[in-house]
């Protein structure tokens, strides 16, 4: 398994590739003097106009894409040189949707809208027809049983796996018959740092529930991938059916509620605050010593300031957490 930081961490492109795109964009936008490379000095970006920052982001994104493409090409070339291409399956995918524009899909990374959940999956290997396409929804937890089937393993798998083998879909596309997926696709995301939503897909329909308010949305994502037409008011029976199945699954696996998440986060912040308060007491006691060296005195003073600042920061986070608990935003 190869896990690329591109396109993820901002400064992971090669300088030579990044410079190439900085020059291209500078020429296209008629930027005299070129676009500065701020990757090694992010603090300098404060003095750079927003337009140049945006162009740098574009150049860096393009460079990361090219570097990733080159890296994957090197892996494929090595497989070919070793004569393994006819006996190897290559899966290419992503852990979540993109963090920027994902039109026509809504949302993106860390969101339960389709742009956060739908990712590319490209597969090459024995029995997979070239240039074929399959529209059957699958999930990455299907990989284990799929690899098991592709390898022809006789070893038994646990009975409680969430995933299914998608071998038939890889080989026959939409004509492939997949095993029954009783639980559907459940994406339970009771997060305190973003919009808390549970998404549940069963067949063509996707139900979304806001975990602060309980508000429900329903979409036919097979026909409406942009999730522009909420069907919850016109299909109450479908909402009831899917809600019951979703709640049964969440209860079965012991899924956390938002109340538990918020309380855990608040307790964590309170614990950090108490630790800093205790440190402040200790630092002040140490500073009372008359024989303390100047270097140590300065160090303790800086640590005292740091602990005080951290208490202020954690209290601000608590204030924001209290506001987030009342938020009804979907994005």
Describe these PLM feature segments.
Residues 161, 168-177:
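Acidic, glycine-rich loop-and-strand cores that form catalytic or ligand-binding grooves
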Residues 49, 143, 212-215, 221, ...:
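Long, internal low-complexity/basic segments
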Residues 1-144, 148-161, 199, 209-212, ...:
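Active-site-proximal cap/lid insertion segments
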Residues 140, 162-164, 183, 193:
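Conserved glycosyltransferase catalytic-site signature
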Residues 4-6, 190-192, 264-268:
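Glycine-rich beta-alpha junction loops
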Residues 181-188:
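WW-domain-binding short linear motifs
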Residues 196-209, 217:
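Short, surface-exposed beta-strand/loop micro-motifs that present aromatic residues
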């Amino acid at each position: 398994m190869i896990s690329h930081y591109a396109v993820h961490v901002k400064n992971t492109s090669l300088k030579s590739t990044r410079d190439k795109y900085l020059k291209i964009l500078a020429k296209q936008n008629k930027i005299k003097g070129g676009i500065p490379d701020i990757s090694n000095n992010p603090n300098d970006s404060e003095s750079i106009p927003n337009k140049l920052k945006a162009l740098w982001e574009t150049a860096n994104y393009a460079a990361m894409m090219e570097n990733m493409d080159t890296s994957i090409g090197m892996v494929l070339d090595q497989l070919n040189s070793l004569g393994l291409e006819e006996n190897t399956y290559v899966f290419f995918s992503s852990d979540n949707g993109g963090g920027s524009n994902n039109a026509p899909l809504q949302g993106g990374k860390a969101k339960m809208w389709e742009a956060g959940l739908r990712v590319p999956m490209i597969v090459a290997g024995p029995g997979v027809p070239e240039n074929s396409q399959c529209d059957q929804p699958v999930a990455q937890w299907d990989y284990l049983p799929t690899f098991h089937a592709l390898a022809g393993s006789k070893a038994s798998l646990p009975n409680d796996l969430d995933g299914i083998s998608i071998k038939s879909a890889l080989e026959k596309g939409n004509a492939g018959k997949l095993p029954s997926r009783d639980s559907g696709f459940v994406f339970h995301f009771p997060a305190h740092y973003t919009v808390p939503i549970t998404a549940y897909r069963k067949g063509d329909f996707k139900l979304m529930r806001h975990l602060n308010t309980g508000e429900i949305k329903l979409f036919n994502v097979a026909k409406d991938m942009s999730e522009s037409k909420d069907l919850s008011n016109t299909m109450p029976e479908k909402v009831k059916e899917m809600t019951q199945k979703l709640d049964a699954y969440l209860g079965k696996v012991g899924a956390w509620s938002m109340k538990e998440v918020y309380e855990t986060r608040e307790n964590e912040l309170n614990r950090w605050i108490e630790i800093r308060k205790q440190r402040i007491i200790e630092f002040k006691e140490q500073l009372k010593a008359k024989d303390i060296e100047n270097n140590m005195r300065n160090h303790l003073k800086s640590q005292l300031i740091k602990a005080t600042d951290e208490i202020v920061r954690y209290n601000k986070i608590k204030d924001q957490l209290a506001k987030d608990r009342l938020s009804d935003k979907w994005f």
